[in-house]
Amino acid sequence: MIEVLCNDILVNIFRHYLDVSPQFWFTLGHVCRSWRRIIFTSPLGLCLRLHCTHRKPVLKTLDYWPPLPLVVNYGGSPRLHPPAPEDEENIMAALEKAARVHSISLTVSNSLLKHFPIIPGPFSELEELSLQSQDNAQLTLPSAFWWGHRLRMLHSTRIAFPSLPHLLSPSQDLVDLQLHEIPGVGYFPPEAFADALCGMIQLQTLSLHFLSLPPRRTYLTLPPPPGDRIVLPALTCFKYRGISKYLDSLVARIDAPHLVVIGITLFNQPTLDASHLGSFINRIEMQGSPYRVDILSSGGTISITITHPGTVTKLELKISCKQLDWQLSSICQICDYLSPFLFRVEDLGIDTTGSSSVPDDMDAEQWVRLMLAFRSAKDFRVAGECATDILRALHSADEGQKTVLPALRNLHVQERVSMLDFGPFQDSVESFVTQRRLSGHSVQLYYSESRYTCQICCVGFRLWQDFIRHLKEKHPHQYMCPYCGIFQWSKERNYLFLEHLESEHPEVVPADVLILNPDLESFIPYSHDAGQ
């Protein structure tokens, strides 16, 4: 049946096959002489490429093949195997055909890099370039390694490009530009980099990830020079990691009206300079309010995430630092710069579930300063170890006639509270809600997650009745303190448990333990309705 198909139909069939597996065109060519003739007479229509990769004798066979475009693939990303030492001759044999190289995906070692200066001329047909240093070494490419105007994708990891802005300027067709873990010697001025982006109307992804602080900061000490902004109309994803001043100088020079995803991580600095960041975000063509903001404190970072419900737009900004007071100081500075934008936020959440320990001299005013930026917030979600401190700070501010979150209507408590911490936490919730009601600004309270946690098995419950039922069914006659999950005692020495309660959990009503262990009834001086 296949013998009656004309050549044009066979070419279309081959094209569909090679769209999925482009490197296997030679398999089709070995089926029969007729197919081989069709393939070699349609190299452009079938986008034929010679794939130079592991376990292929490139050096010995390259000159015997037709002069097809070359794909050099020896690593280039953490997911791919790096080249072996015996691959270096094959790699260089392919790279020396620079005018034919269409794509390079390469993990570069120091020994391989030493051969790069002999590469003749530019990679004039290069469309895709992905380079990664081997063994986390910081490498600098020789000036002889450069490309032409056809480049569409550039990825690098721990690779420094001499005069990168000059190299990028001709690459007007770039779609994807990701430079990660840029070594100190690879720093380039933000203004020159912005100028190099001029005319890149197809650029969709831009990612800059600096490995460390710049070796010299002379070009970052002055404010960004005035000038026309570079418009990147197709840019939808922008990611950055480095110091705030570099970011500020860069975003002062570019407009990206259709950005969808923004991911920024700033190095820890006492003073953050991001005065142009708010204007940059405001120039993004997003639909109007309401916006949702989530502030998350973890052991090593604090982040603010801004999303727009109903869209895929997302801005995430992280600051790398460990101490909670430093985290708050940094995020407050960022919120000051974003204040023209944040006043539209109607849904605010603060989660300190994974935060580091709170300093003893922690100033509650830092929480107040943070929340002052969200004067339009109608919904407030609070969770984590600092939930009690946050609500106390809100209550104290209200008492001092300094109303924070004046538009607040709904308080969502997302908290798993152990019995040890439940008393102070519940007091802070009730005090704040009562204060708002008395001031004529009632707040509706919602418990969104577990309020009680069994410390024996770490299971959380929203309702007290469910918590008690769990203790009866899962831990009957369990001689382990359910309030801390640490203290244990024997049945013959029940008095030790009561002593433990008095010293470690004085807020716990002793009669409640009868539900857990009826054997203690003779030791309880009074009774109490546990359901109250």
Where are the regions a protein language model picked out?
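Leucine-rich repeat
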Residues: 1-450, 454, 458, 476, ...
